[in-house]
Structures are given as C-alpha cells and as structure tokens.
Amino acid sequence: MKRRLLFLFAVFMVGASVGWGQMIPTYYKVAVGTDGDGSSAGSPIYKTNLETALSDAALSSLDSVIILLPEGVYSANAAPYFITKSSLAIIGEGDTSTVTIKSPVDIGLTNGGNVSFQKVHLTAKTSTGRGVVDIKSSKTTVSF
C-alpha cells in the first residue's frame, strides 16, 4: 500500500510538472486581408494592422501575447493600449531594416511584466521629440 501510494504520488508530480511550466501565448499576426481567429492553440489570430493587434492583445484571456509583424512599415494610434499581461513580445518576421514601426505607441502594462521588441526597427515620426514607444508601468523589463 505504501509503495502504491508513493508511486501514485510520483506519477502525479511528474504529470503536474509537465503542464505547470507551459504557457501558451496568444499569437497575433498582422497580415493583408480580413481579420480571423486561430483555430487551435498556438496558431495565430490574423489582424489587418498593428493597432487592431494591440487593441485585441489587451482583451486576450491568456497571460502572454506575441505579435508577429511581416516585412513592412507599421503605425498605430498613439492612444494607450492597456495590456494587463505578464509578457508582450512584438517580433518582426523579416530583417530589422524591413520591419519598421514609425508612429508613437503607448503601452500601459498595469501589472508590470516583460515587453520585448525583436527584429523591429523603431523610428520617430513626430517633430515633438517624443519617443516611439512609451511604456507606462512599474517593475517592467524591456528588451530590444
């Protein structure tokens, strides 16, 4: 009986640890065409522009959001996008010189967390000297 209980406990621990560390993010992919949703976990939700992807990221039920940007030049409304997630990544799918965000984007992470920009070229389009990305949060890690 003791061995069986110990064996069941070991099986439970292994089963719990396998799923414990897996965090399936919400993937958004900006693409030409109509909006659509991912048909399975890990498949992207297609959005027609960066602004729509950022707006929907704030509404995602999952705690991690990844926005994939194909080669091109992107802009979004400077209105704040309040994203209450632990992780937000904006990733360019092309070379850094071919994925550009030109307009100011305000990201509000109300719960802190991590913001990551990968393979994306950020350029300011305003004449006010304002930065391209304004992240309003405390205890936040930002990586480029």
Task: Label the model's feature ranges.
Residues 141-144:
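Short, intrinsically disordered, charge-balanced linker/junction segments flanking boundaries
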Residues 18-52, 73:
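Right-handed parallel beta-helix/beta-solenoid
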Residues 51-52, 80-81, 103-108:
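A short, sequence-level motif marking secondary-structure junctions
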Residues 8-16:
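Bacterial N-terminal signal peptides
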Residues 75, 86-134:
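Right-handed parallel beta-helix/beta-spiral solenoid domain characteristic of secreted/periplasmic
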Residues 1-4:
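Positively charged n-region of N-terminal signal peptides that target proteins for export
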Residues 28-34, 53-76, 87-94:
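Glycine-rich repeat segments that build the extracellular carbohydrate-interaction surface of secreted
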Residues 58-63, 83-84, 109-111, 136:
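Flexible, charged surface loops at secondary-structure boundaries
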